[in-house]
Structures are given as structure tokens and as C-alpha cells.
Amino acid sequence: KDDEILISELEHHSNIVPWQMMCEKNGAKIKVIPLTSKGELNYDSFLNLLSKKTKLVFVNHVSNALGTINPIKSIISKAHEFGAAVLIDGAQASSHIKADLQELNVDFYTTSAHKLCGPTGIGMLFGKKEWLNKMPPYQGGGEMISEVTFEKTTYADLPHKFEAGTPNIVGAIGFGMALDYLNNIGFSNIESYELDLLNYATNKLKEIPGFKIYGEAKNKTSVISFNVGDLHSYDIGTILDKFGIAVRTGQHCAQPVMDYFGISGTVRASFSFYNTKEEIDYFCKSLERAIAMLS
């Protein structure tokens, strides 16, 4: 009771709802690190919110809605000064930028295989042994036990303590192959190539009348979240789909971000290492056609 968890206004719903559920059970409180108009985490507010009551800081490495890269190394360091653990959601970051978890000194870091060219239904949680050894298992079953009697059960060593039952074997193999594939390309190569695509697309899209980008952080990945005039994001996305262009529309499971900007949603274009400038040219022309059809 009275313990505090810090999360940011940039979070995906999956980084908000579980903590709300937990706080309802144990009486802890959630404190929210606000955004700036550029879609960046307000670092000064973060520093002011930190206190001895802070037990956990949970922020995303990269915003899935805006592409903002958060200054997680500094966040981790400052949180540790107050004795707080830090959990970083790396789902949106892991396929675009390299994260050295040892250098970051992060307590927990998560990601999902499907964001890394891998299969759905499997992900990864990195945790420091000092924390994982203190934590009880969250599931019971086979493999996670050392010895079972009707009087008492003892648990297996890490990581098996947290891996009850038959694992997703096919998913794990696919995840491993996907990581080998990306490592062969090289994350530094991916990051520099995607940054070039981002700059190219941003400059071309800004030439379109009424085009507005949400989230213009100095440091961001290859995500452009936008609207055009008063056109609805869903309508734009539907027409682009007919032209063979895949974009995401709506709130991107980040309703607080949309609320901050006072909008119902955006069109989100995400560029990856397999995209080309020629495809961006086609995207821009198709967007102009969609705008003309809807105007």
C-alpha cells in the first residue's frame, strides 16, 4: 500500500491495464509521466515524480504510436538512485535499434517475436537473477518444479521456474531463426537504413497540403503517425489498402496518446529494412489519390 509505479503517457494499453489491475488488488498507486507537444517523455516531470515510494518504473523503449525513442539509459540510472526497479517494454524497439541490456543495467526488458520477423505467440523477458530469484512462479505445472510432495513443492532453478508446462517449441525455434536472420543483416545496418527511409518519407509527405505529423521527437524510429486535414484515418487507411499499401489506423492501443493530442486516431506508416524509396514514392502518390477521392 502507498507504493508507487511510474509509467508514461506514451504507453501501449498492455503497459497500463495490468498495472491498474495490480494496483486495485494491493493498493499501490500509478503516477504518470506526461508527454510534451513533440511526443517526447517529459524528463523533468519524470525526475519530479521519482521518490522513495517509487518501486517500479515502466516505460517503453520506443513508442509504438509515435516512434519516439525514450532516453532509457538515463531513466534507468535515475530510478536506481531511488532504489526502484525498471522494466522496459522493448517490443517496438527491438527490430529497429540495438539494445545492450548489460550496458543499460536494466532490471527487466521484454520483447515479442512477431516484432522481430518471428512467429506470434512467443516473446522474451530478460530479468536480472537477483530479481528473478526473489520472485515466486506465476504458473504451476511440469518442468518448473524440483521436487513435489503433498507437504511442499520446491521449484526448479532459473529460467525453468517460470516456464511451466510444454513450451511453444515451434515458436522458440522460429524465434531463434528470426534472430539469426536479423543478426546476419546487422542491427546497425538496419538502424541507419531505416533512418534514411524515415527522413526521405518525412520530407516528401510534408509537401502534401494539410498533412500533419504527430510525434516529431528528435530521436525516433521509422514510424510516421499522421492525419490529413479533417479526413478520418480509417477512410484513408481503407483506400490505401485498395492500393496495396498496409498502414495501421486508429488509436494504436495507445488511447492516452490520442487523448493528449485531442484526436480520435491517426494513420501510422511504419518502414522496415525491406522497404525502399520507390515504395515510399508509390505510398505518397497513393496517399494523394486517397485524399483527392475523400475531399
Task: List the model feature ranges, each with a label.
Residues 1-295:
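Pyridoxal 5′-phosphate
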